[in-house]
């Protein structure tokens, strides 16, 4: 590693005799990882932890995850990502790099970003995956935090997520929010809501029939958020959610992940041991 980061995590997973093990766990700076053994299916389950409680102005973080052939791992954040104010105008950054080999399966369930007053934040995620691999990837952003509890007091938020299959760019999604320049409540932005989340699922098992069945499944739930599902040009889908609370949005995300787990892989529902989980 040539660049110096304020926090760095590298996780690697391999299949050994039909069982996934963590063959690499590296952590430095403000970043830590913690294992949890609560998954009933025996899937390695890790929390990403920031020891400082949040990201300080100008800090840079890196998360690298490698999932080898036939391995399955679950990675989530312990808490939302708090981005503190940037009084000097410096950009705070986090980069995530994910590699998925043949028939591997990663569930990356990140909590939303909560930008503080005057904060500036840029997040990039690059996923390189084999066409036979399976991916569940979620993230989000809120209206932020300020002492006066006023929404959208941050200066700059940018989130770029790109997925490559066999070195070809197949999905690119960018969220750019500059509340001082944009009306965050109008159509196409938050539309009166305070929380936005997205979920991307890519798998050779996802087709139009699966997408329609998932849509019907979600419509049968008592949900308080607005959501929409779209099929991708590849075998996959993207779910976008606007809601009053992050907890309401996460309920939809977990429901989608559970549906995929059960219908495609025959696994039990997620148990992320989060305080807002409502089963």
Swiss-Prot record:
Molecular functions (GO terms): nickel cation binding
Compartment(s) where it occurs, according to its Swiss-Prot or TrEMBL record: Cytoplasm
Segment forming the signal sequence: none
InterPro entries: UreD
Pfam families membership: UreD
GO cellular component terms listed in the entry, alphabetical order: cytoplasm
Source domain of life: Bacteria
PANTHER family documented for this protein: UREASE ACCESSORY PROTEIN D (PTHR33643:SF1)
Family: Belongs to the UreD family.
Physiological role: Required for maturation of urease via the functional incorporation of the urease nickel metallocenter.
Name of the featured protein: Urease accessory protein UreD
Species of the source: Streptococcus thermophilus (strain ATCC BAA-250 / LMG 18311)
Gene: ureD
